[in-house]
Amino acid sequence: AADSYYQQFGDKNFNGGLGFIYQYDSRDIPVNAWKGFYLNASATFYGCYLGGDNDYQVYQLDVRKYFNLFNRQGSTLASQLKWRASTGDVPYGELSQPGTPFDLRGYTWGQYRAQDMIFAIVEYRYMFMKKDQTLSKSGVVGWVGGGTLGEKMDEYEGFLANLGVGYRFEVQPRMNLRIDFGWGVETFGFYFNFNEAF
């Protein structure tokens, strides 16, 4: 079936917007946090008055918390809650889309699109120890998560379950090469990247 958003907006749009961001960050190392808290809240207002093709708004909230477990280095429980909502004449390419290497890993990016999306992930990260009790360069992760999408908050439909495992190799101090295998509902994804997903 043809996508109504694609039929309305096509694949080419120019959009200009103004907005604001509030951010708080107490993470020890942003690209590979072992402890701390992160909050990012933003609102962006796009309009034809700025030379764009569409009038719409995007609101986002990203909350992350990191805990050290078992009183040892390299043992971290990371959690994330993210909400994204849009209103107005939202272009096809600006709809919320899970499935990137930084959210519900395991879904195909663009397979699901809607104006609103919310998801949560909990991930355990473990770096192995050497015999001398210093951290090695290798580690593993495992995560569970899920989310939902809809045209409005009161119209969310279905649940996108998510889980996965991964391997980490430290290429620089506290900067990892990331290999992840994620599963969604009847979908699978493989990810090769640097730094943690969140």
Regions found by a protein language model. Give the residues of each.
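Transmembrane beta-barrel wall of Gram-negative outer-membrane proteins
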Residues: 1-7
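C-terminal outer-membrane beta-barrel translocator/porin domains of Gram-negative envelope proteins
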Residues: 7-11, 18-134, 192
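Outer-membrane beta-barrel "beta-signal"
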Residues: 19, 169, 187-198
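Short, contiguous acidic/charged loop-to-helix segments that flank catalytic cores in large enzymes
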Residues: 107-113, 152-156, 182
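C-terminal hydrophobic structural anchor segments
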Residues: 125-160
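ATP phosphate-binding glycine-rich loop and adjacent ATP-lid/helix-beta elements
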Residues: 164-166
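Low-complexity, intrinsically disordered Gly/Pro/Thr-rich segments
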Residues: 173-181
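A short, acidic, flexible beta-alpha connecting loop/helix-capping segment that sits on the rim
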Residues: 181-187
